[in-house]
Amino acid sequence: MFLLTYLRRAGAVAFGTLLLFGAVSAFQRPLRLYPGFEYPNLPKDLPRDYQEKTEWAFARLMYPPVSPRYGGAEFLGSWKQGESNWTMDYPRSDRHLSAAVRRLTRVHARSVEQPVDLDEGDQFDWPWLYGVEVGHWELTDDQAKAMREYLLRGGFFMCDDFHGTIEWSFFAASMQKVFPDRPIVEIPNKDPIFHTIYDLDDRYQVPGALYLETHRTYEKDGKEPHWRGIYDDRNRLMVAICFDMDLGDSWEHADNPEYPEKFSALGLRIGLNYLIYAMTH
């Protein structure tokens, strides 16, 4: 039923996205691969479309982690070389959501992800940007400025997989650099982002894979999920904050029979709604 409903709308969506992002796609950088924190071995085989210029690809934010002296994890090497917080769930999560986009929408989407470095201006190639474990990021002043410019020009940033009071404080410190004059608010149920494709009034906490061991949907002191955001002056949502939940794991484990289907289903629906919202607003 959803697919039929979506296909009726998709002609306008696809046409609109072609107008908005068709010119941008001509300047997209080639695919870059990095060793991931969970998946350190680079894939040997890539799909045929891995270098195709498309309307959308899973654009994953690269960022410097919080210093170990302030409680950050100790990593070997530079965050610019992978195996840092920004690579959590990468690339499996990215490719599962990309497969859902290709299967359930008419958006011209690539099968593989694209790591994005704010220091190089990559963000302007993509209308939708995803950041994971942002309770561990520490943006520089220049990176915050680059993010602000991207968002005010029409970009969209979705962040996910951080939990509890301490991680929120680290997240908010860097986001305050991006928008010192804009508040973070709870997104109301009536916001179009919850009704772009799916009606998502009935939302619940989506846990990470740790749920399979603990049977708890929360981590640390983050017992209640929050869908928060930052709006521009025209009431467009620029930043969608998925706090005290782990949508990335729900995508990553969508094909794991032990991970409950209801969590993957909601996680994918939220991801698709946010993506289509980003490409049409």
Spans of features found by a protein language model:
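N-terminal secretory signal peptides that target proteins for export/translocation
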Residues: 1-7
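Bacterial N-terminal signal peptides
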Residues: 10-22
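Aromatic-Pro/Gly-enriched surface loop or interdomain linker
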Residues: 27-128, 134-135, 246-249, 253-281
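An acidic, glycine-rich "communication" segment
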Residues: 33-40, 66, 70-73, 166-248, ...
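Short alpha-beta junction capping motif
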Residues: 58, 123-168
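Extracytoplasmic/secreted envelope proteins and their assembly/folding machinery
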Residues: 94, 98, 144, 148, ...
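A generic secondary-structure signal for well-formed alpha-helical elements
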Residues: 105, 155, 178-182, 278
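Surface-exposed patches in mature extracellular/periplasmic domains of secreted proteins
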Residues: 107-117, 159-164, 182-190
